[in-house]
A protein has these predicted regions:
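N-terminal signal-anchor module of multipass membrane proteins
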Residues: 1-61, 68-79
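Membrane-embedded helical hairpins/re-entrant loop segments and their flanking transmembrane helices
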Residues: 2, 6-9, 34-52, 58, ...
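Hydrophobic alpha-helical transmembrane segments of multi-pass membrane proteins
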Residues: 16-20, 115, 119, 140, ...
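Juxtamembrane interface elements at the cytosolic ends of transmembrane helices
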Residues: 24-27, 151-156, 167, 187-196, ...
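Short, non-helical or kinked segments that cap or interrupt transmembrane helices
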Residues: 35-41, 57-69, 111-120, 165-170, ...
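Interfacial segments of multi-pass membrane proteins
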Residues: 72-80, 157, 279-294, 300-305
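Membrane-embedded alpha-helical modules
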Residues: 79-191, 298-404
Length: 408
């Protein structure tokens, strides 16, 4: 079913489903760093709307709490307190703004030179595979529940028709949650204690961030890895939606939107936000990539942030239920990376291509970490950086040079 054939009701249902996919990670980050989950939901929704405004409503991306800043926020809050640390997130926004201006200045030729398919393909694969450990960790808390959730989602996706085929995630979560409740492993105490309506604490008791240079400068190098991951995520979404969002509206706009969303998040007391691969995976399996559906997910996040019992109900979903669903979603992202390599006819008989792909994947899967003073880069950011450097320094064959000149 195409995006154009979706009725408003179906768009709403799929949009709510996308929030279910993003909910777990969005509220987990604030819990780990000592921030309020309801505020994180609010800033995720607000940040997504800001992103869509800047990108002219063209790019189907959902922004949620970023895991990349968990350790830096915990460390910085011990030195400068949480208000000062959140103000330091402005340094993250600055990095996005600078990169946006650089890409706008140099144009798409710079992107094509730094991120050809031989680099982007393995980076997309790693975005999926790097999340697989989190999926397994969640699923292994109760494999029976995880496989029930996964099996339900796969069955609906494979055999469903009409509306059912669009909601495999909701079906998987609903069945898994019901079985978990019958087994007595769902804790409803949070739902009972939660108020029906309550503003997020950061909004009810709003305080301006306390700006200081120290946390601002501390956060700047931390932002490099998320910025590199942002590029990979935009390429993933482009592949899933079959549209080149690096051309229209342009990567400079997606960078600017992400930066402004981070700025808004810290202003309202939430964690920094980033593009969410979980939602991209859900788009890939449902084939629904309409940006309006993502905006429905963002609006739902804001609504849930003020309806305490709904938010608490989602927080009561066992990790195993979400883990089972993530096993499907994250694997789907990795398959998009493989498809990207095939679609662009990357020749694996070329030694140069084999080297770039092999080293990029090994660095990412192996968990390599590069530390220089207070600066640390790892994961997707480091892998993408290694891929870019190898692509620039390894000599091309005459055939590759000719093909590149034709594309230019």
């Amino acid at each position: 079913m195409s995006n154009l054939q979706l009725s408003p009701m179906r768009k709403t249902i799929v949009g709510v489903q996308f929030l279910f996919v993003a909910f777990g990670a969005t509220v987990l980050v604030p819990l780990l760093v000592g921030l309020d989950p309801a505020t994180a939901l609010f800033t995720a929704g607000l940040g997504t709307f800001i992103f869509h405004l800047v990108t002219k409503g063209k790019v189907p991306i959902f922004l949620g709490s970023s895991f990349a800043f968990i350790t830096p926020i915990i460390s910085a809050s011990k030195q400068w307190g949480m208000p000062g640390t959140l103000a330091g997130i402005a340094g993250v926004a600055l990095v996005y703004f600078v990169m946006s201006a650089l890409i706008k200045w140099q144009g798409k030729k710079l992107l094509d030179k730094l991120f050809p398919p031989v680099v982007i393909g393995p980076v997309i694969i790693l975005i999926g595979l790097s999340l697989s450990k989190a999926a397994v960790d969640m699923a292994k808390t109760n494999w029976l529940i995880a496989f029930i959730s996964l099996g339900t989602a796969v069955t609906v996706l494979s055999m469903g028709r009409g509306l059912m085929k669009l909601v495999p995630v909701i079906c998987g979560i609903a069945v898994g949650y019901s079985v978990a409740a019958l087994m007595g492993i769902v804790n409803f105490s949070g739902v009972e204690a939660a108020p029906w309506f309550a503003l997020p604490p950061a909004l009810a008791h709003f305080q301006l961030p306390q700006f200081a240079w120290e946390p601002f400068l501390y956060m700047i190098p931390v932002a490099i890895a998320p910025v590199i991951e942002h590029v990979g995520d935009v390429y993933v979404v482009s592949a899933v939606a079959d549209k080149d969002f690096t051309k229209s509206p342009g990567l400079h706009r997606t960078m600017l939107g992400d930066g402004l969303a981070c700025l808004a998040a810290c202003f309202f007391g939430g964690p920094p936000v980033t593009t969410y691969s979980e939602v991209t995976g859900a788009m890939s399996i449902t084939k629904v990539t309409h940006p309006q559906v993502i905006r429905i997910a963002a609006a739902t996040a804001i609504v849930f942030s003020v309806i305490g019992k709904l938010s608490a109900l989602l927080q009561s979903i066992p990790s195993a239920v979400l883990g089972g669903i993530m096993l499907l979603l994250f694997g789907t992202i990795a398959s998009v990376g493989i498809q990207n390599l095939i679609q662009h006819k990357v020749d694996l008989n070329q030694t140069r291509n084999v080297i770039i792909i092999s080293v990029t994947l090994t660095v990412g899967i192996g968990g390599a970490v590069l530390t220089w003073g207070n600066f640390t880069i790892s994961g997707i950011g480091l892998s993408a950086l290694v891929g870019v450097i190898l692509n620039l320094i390894l000599p091309q064959t005459e055939v590759e040079k000719t093909e590149e000149e034709k594309e230019a």
